[in-house]
Amino acid sequence: MCIVKTLHLITHVMKEYNSQFTEGSDFSLIEEQILEFWKENNIFKKSIENRDEKRRFVFYDGPPFANGLPHYGHLLTGFIKDTVARYKTMAGFRVDRRFGWDCHGLPAEMLAEKELGVSGKLAIEEFGIEKFNNYCRNSVMKFSREWKQYIDRQSRWVDFENDYKTMNLSFMESIMWSFYQLWQKGLIYESIKIVPYSWACQTPLSNFETRIDNAYRQKTSKTVTLAFELLDAPKSLIVDNITAYKILVWTTTPWTLPCNLALAISPNIKYCGAIINKEMYIFSRAYLKNFEDHCKKNNIEYLIHSDDICYLSLEYLSYKPVFNYFIDIKNAFKVLVADFVVEDEGTGIVHMAPGFGEDDFILCKKQGIPDIDDKDTSKLLATICPIDDGGKFTERISDFVNMHVFDTNDQIISILKAKNLCFKTDQYLHNYPHCWRTDTPLIYRAMSSWYVEVTKIKNRMIDLNKDVNWIPSHIRSGQFGKWLENAKDWAISRNRFWGTPLPVWKSDNPNYPRIDVYGSIKKVFDDIKALEEDFDIPIDDLHRPYIDNLVRPNPDDPTGKSMMRRVTDVFDCWFESGSMPYAQLHYPFENKELFENYFPADFITEYVAQTRGWFYTLFVLSTALFDKPPFKNCICHGVVLDTQGQKLSKRLNNYADPMEIFKQYGSDAMRFLMLSHTVSYGGDLLLDKDGVMVRDVIRNVIKPMWNSYNFFTIYADIDKVSARVISDLDEVDNIMDKYIMCECISTIQSIFNAMEEFDQSVGNYGYNIKAACNSIVQFFEVLNNWYIRRCRSRFWSSEITKDKVNAYNTLYTVMYYMVKVSAPFLPAITEAIWQKLNFQEEESVHLSLLPNIEHITLKDEDQKNIQYMKLIINICGCVLSIRNVRNIRVRQPLNKITIYSYNNNNDLFNLPVKYQNILLDEINVKSIVFKSNIEDIASFQLKLNFPELGKRIPEKMKNLISLLKSNQWKVLENGQLMLGIREGEYYILEDNEYTLNLKVHSEFASTITLGPNLLGVLVLDNTLTDELIMEGIARDIVRIIQQSRKDNKFNVSDKIDVVICTQDKMVKNSVQAWYEYIVQQTLSLSLVIHENLDANNVAEYCKTTMKDRNLTLFIKKL
């Protein structure tokens, strides 16, 4: 049984004292007072300025969009950022926490379109780009005040005064510089490619934008299997009386059929020919069963002519187009051969629409389809991709002009049926990419875009990724590593309005081609082109349309007629956020030394999907520009969902307003819930709507910490004791003091290890916030439910003895250390305790340094102390569990426990007397008996793991079964299990090849374990004598009096009179025998017992009853 579970059991069974100190504690109000204290005293500012500028810890705060309110995901990220920043600050580092805002891009434009009532690029251009962008500029920070309120209330320290915005001129100039550098390195090119396209936003997306935020979701599409009629019969298939040869093609996008320009078959597929009504249908051999099933279902007679048709028989055959919109295109409407065609789905033959498929585009381009010069970009795109920005067909597709492509599917299928070309239709459920902003299904279309040639630097990115400490560690070679291995060139241009413009000017006359790329506004560097130098005009805004007005003659045109005009695209906003490490500092124009000395960042965190978003774009640009990874350590946290695993949304009404949670419970509880959960380590948090999980943190974490502080102050104030911090363990001689001090030092070290050391079990260096939180929880469990409870009598004694002072000093010392080390994880409540305990150190706990325990060395004796104490805590848990199950009151003393040692365990046999005494007192038992013959009370049951044994010694399986049945096995002194006997054939089994279960033969027995190790078995003697019963009654009376004191709100130091009325002889005898014990425990100055009592004599007393003993008890405060 683990220590924490044991202590929970002790707390539950003993009905511990904690509750008396927590009633009325308003942690939310306490937090608000602390927030005000930090603000009034500039504690955050001091926490930065008090640290050495040359000893920096750098973390990047990813810029959010400020046009919506923060959600729980933002809070989680913020809690992790703030915790690490506070921890490193207390470790002595200077941690700047500059906040940033993502201002450009689709989120801002979509909001502006909605609020302005304009939709689409043409409408925006008619409205006016200048007016539209000005609206975006003014609305993009719409919720910045609310963001600040949320962040402040979550006790997160952020520098808003020096925030950066991606729309600032300085930030945008650094983006210009980075693009110029990429251009100079040969990593930028313009090309026509098939890209994911949001027709709702009227812009292309990056390939990674289709992989974030669950962009893929199920969609039902109407599919069609249609027949393309060959113009010539395949020579190997010529048969008399065949009137037509048709190729069957399956497609999930019927709307692309009007743009069909070719068909593709595979050299690796065998094809079939089947005859229906004198027409031969050709399809892959793998499709034959589907073909036959369809024919049988619809009573269609067919004859299989051949199932071994070679692709060579079909290559370059011409076919009749289904639609005549491209009848004039040379080289079109032929059967082409391509390796990408597979037979897993469909007919093994694919229709090619080069404007709407990547493979289609590449294959047709190789074949010169269409026969248009690549340089004539506009004509090529208008031909192969005849749709407008909104996804509607243009005039070329005359039958469907101005119809959205998705709306044409049914009409196209109807036309196919009318032409007798439709073989079958189906509904097809598949995962399909959707726009991350509008939730509309994307299309893939040909567009001219500007690209970063990521494939050129992919291998270097893979190498640099090995130097990053990912948390969790599997991200390195898993989610992020695999993404890098499959990295594609990045389309960074967007044909939108509100964003940093691409600094590219092109000649408007293709006869005099020229491209100018600019890297700065003013001429700062000799080798970087500057806008003001070439255009001879001051520039104070790079946004459209002002930047578009910069036009100059083409220097390469001797006629002087052509002009240099800027390409109209703006940057993908992911390029902007990926540039924040240097752009926030206006590098290289300012802060050059600061950036170069502290790049890459020490730490970064966001949720795990950013491996395909911000983390990725940071990595691309950092590798390309600086040949370095952008960060050294990265936490990829998980996602906050509702209890059903659904995304939190207003529509589902499945989450509580975070500010209401903060108002009711405070933010520390929410912080610790998230930090201590696997969500801080990549898992998902299923958060209830009613705040139950947050309340649990109050009860299990914050209250225990507060209780320990409260316990100290109550009794220290009564005794007027000024405690001090113990600096040397040698000063401590009390066994309980020594234990809790050692446990404190061990806990601090475990937190340091979790946050800073390499952990082989999880494969990363530090930043294990969950483990650090668990250490804090476990310590305060031990402090409250073991140390303080076991030492209450020392604090309650009436005299100020040396032992009492030592107890105060010990509790004060561990609170001093633990408040410090817990401060990053519970910043507000630890600050409150720090202020109240007046440690006479720094003004704030967050200005102090983490505990320095290097000078404190735990000796072997100290380690043994911890081991023995944990052992007796476990034994206590076992005994209390038996009492609980067998309904034996804890206050009822018992005669003895017998402990049977397993394998002569020395920890049990050598348990010192002083620990035995603590154990006996705790479990309320009179004596311990140790025995070694465990077989008298328990037996082992061996179960072999045959699959594992079969891997190692498969030929011995019969022998093993025989030995097991004959019970020929034993555990050796070294802990290994031997099957067989040494004189004959025997086998030493590995740990994973068997399980050994111990079965006890008494209902009053329990196994004793420490960690994974079996130590022995204990048996509780439940025999009761009159003496034991009377002592139990005395303890019950003490409990009733204490409960009555609490119910009547007496102070813990109040003296009382007690009157007991009962006719129970056993109760009378008990009171007489245990009189001194009862009055001492309850601070009673008198205790009188009566058989009958006049109510008038106790009119001023508080009354309570003990029903199972027919006892009435009266107390009065003196």
UniProtKB/Swiss-Prot annotation:
The keyword Oxidoreductase does not apply. InterPro entries: aa-tRNA-synth_I_CS, aa-tRNA-synth_Ia, Anticodon_Ile_ABEc, Ile-tRNA-ligase, Ile-tRNA-ligase_type2, M/V/L/I-tRNA-synth_anticd-bd, Rossmann-like_a/b/a_fold, tRNAsynth_Ia_anticodon-bd. It catalyses: tRNA(Ile) + L-isoleucine + ATP = L-isoleucyl-tRNA(Ile) + AMP + diphosphate. Its cofactor is Zn(2+). It is found in: Cytoplasm. Keywords: Aminoacyl-tRNA synthetase, ATP-binding, Cytoplasm, Ligase, Metal-binding, Nucleotide-binding, Protein biosynthesis, Zinc. One of its GO terms (biological process) is isoleucyl-tRNA aminoacylation. Its EC number is 6.1.1.5. A motif ('HIGH' region) lies at residues 64-74. The keyword Aminoacyl-tRNA synthetase applies. ATP binds at K650. Its main location: cytoplasm. Pfam families: Anticodon_1 (PF08264), DUF5915 (PF19302), tRNA-synt_1 (PF00133). One of its GO terms (molecular function) is zinc ion binding. A motif ('KMSKS' region) lies at residues 647-651. Belongs to the class-I aminoacyl-tRNA synthetase family. IleS type 2 subfamily. PANTHER family: ISOLEUCINE--TRNA LIGASE, CYTOPLASMIC, SOLEUCYL-TRNA SYNTHETASE. Catalyzes the attachment of isoleucine to tRNA(Ile). As IleRS can inadvertently accommodate and process structurally similar amino acids such as valine, to avoid such errors it has two additional distinct tRNA(Ile)-dependent editing activities. One activity is designated as 'pretransfer' editing and involves the hydrolysis of activated Val-AMP. The other activity is designated 'posttransfer' editing and involves deacylation of mischarged Val-tRNA(Ile). IleRS has two distinct active sites: one for aminoacylation and one for editing. The misactivated valine is translocated from the active site to the editing site, which sterically excludes the correctly activated isoleucine. The single editing site contains two valyl binding pockets, one specific for each substrate (Val-AMP or Val-tRNA(Ile)). This is Isoleucine--tRNA ligase. The lineage of its organism: Bacteria, Pseudomonadati, Pseudomonadota, Alphaproteobacteria, Rickettsiales. The gene is ileS.
